[in-house]
Amino acid sequence: MRLDQRALDQLRDVKITRNYTRYAEGSVLVEFGHTKVLCTASIDNSVPRFLKGQGQGWVTAEYGMLPRSTHTRSDREAARGKQTGRTQEIQRLIGRSLRAMVDLKKLGENTITIDCDVIQADGGTRTAAITGAAVALIDAMNVLLEKKKIKQDPLKGLVAAISVGIYQDEVLLDLCYEEDSNCQTDLNVVMTQAGEFIEIQGTAEEKPFTRTQANAMLEVAEKGIQELIKKQQQALGW
C-alpha cells in the first residue's frame, strides 16, 4: 500500500469542474488528489505572425505556480523578471500536447491560449494541467462553433497525461509529491484517446531502469490515461 492507501496502479481522486470562472471561453478546475490547477482557454481572432495568411489557427499554453502553491512561498516569476527553465519546458509540453488534439486548419485564423495556473501542488502538476486544459480547449472551440467563427469542429480526439514511477522496484501510477521525490525513476506520459503517444519524459534518479520496467510503466500509464479520458468525457457530458 502507498502513503494514501491507494493501490499501486490507482489514480488519486480526480475531479474536473467546468465553467469554473466567469469570463474565459473555457475554464476548468482540475484536481488530482491535493494537486489543483486552474486551466482557462482564451480566444484571439488572429494568429501569430509566422502563420499569417496560411488559413490555419494556433493553440499555445502558459504555465505558472501561485507563490504559496507549495509548502513554502516562492517569488512570482514576474517579480524575478524571467521564467525558469522548468516553466518554459512545461508550457511547451502543454502546448504540444494540446495541438495534437486539434486540426489547426479547421480552427481557422484563430489562436486559443490556455493558461494553466497551479493553485496547489502535490506532484503531477504538468499532467493535471494537460488533462484539464484539454477540456477547457474543447469548451473554447465549441464557443467558436456556436458563434459561427468556424464551420467545422477542429477536435481530433481527447488527450490526457499521467505520471508513473518506480519506487522500491514497484511501478506506481499518479505520483504524489513525496512519491515523486523518493522514486528511483519517474515518467510523464501524454497520450491520445486513440492510444497513441504524444510525449514520454523519463528520468532515472537512483539507478537506470530496464526495457522491461519501461514497458511496465507505459502499460500502467496507458491504463491510467484511459481512465482519465473517461473522466474527461463524463465532465463534458459525452
UniProtKB/Swiss-Prot annotation:
Enzyme class, UniProt record, top EC level: transferase
Record keywords, A-Z: Nucleotidyltransferase, RNA-binding, rRNA processing, Transferase, tRNA processing, tRNA-binding
Signal peptide: none
CDD domains according to UniProt: RNase_PH_bact
Sequence positions that bind phosphate: 86, 124-126
GO biological process: rRNA catabolic process; rRNA processing; tRNA processing
E.C. numbers: 2.7.7.56
Top-level taxonomic group: Bacteria
Keyword rRNA processing: yes
Gene Ontology molecular function: any one: 3'-5'-RNA exonuclease activity
InterPro entries the UniProt entry points to: ExoRNase_PH_dom1, ExoRNase_PH_dom2, ExoRNase_PH_dom2_sf, PNPase/RNase_PH_dom_sf, Ribosomal_Su5_D2-typ_SF, RNase_PH, RNase_PH_bac-type, RNase_PH_CS
One of the Pfam families matching this protein, by short name: RNase_PH_C
Function: Phosphorolytic 3'-5' exoribonuclease that plays an important role in tRNA 3'-end maturation. Removes nucleotide residues following the 3'-CCA terminus of tRNAs; can also add nucleotides to the ends of RNA molecules by using nucleoside diphosphates as substrates, but this may not be physiologically important. Probably plays a role in initiation of 16S rRNA degradation (leading to ribosome degradation) during starvation.
Subunit: Homohexameric ring arranged as a trimer of dimers.
NCBIfam families: RNasePH
Family: Belongs to the RNase PH family.
The name this protein goes by in its record: Ribonuclease PH
Organism: Acinetobacter baylyi (strain ATCC 33305 / BD413 / ADP1)
This protein's encoding gene: rph
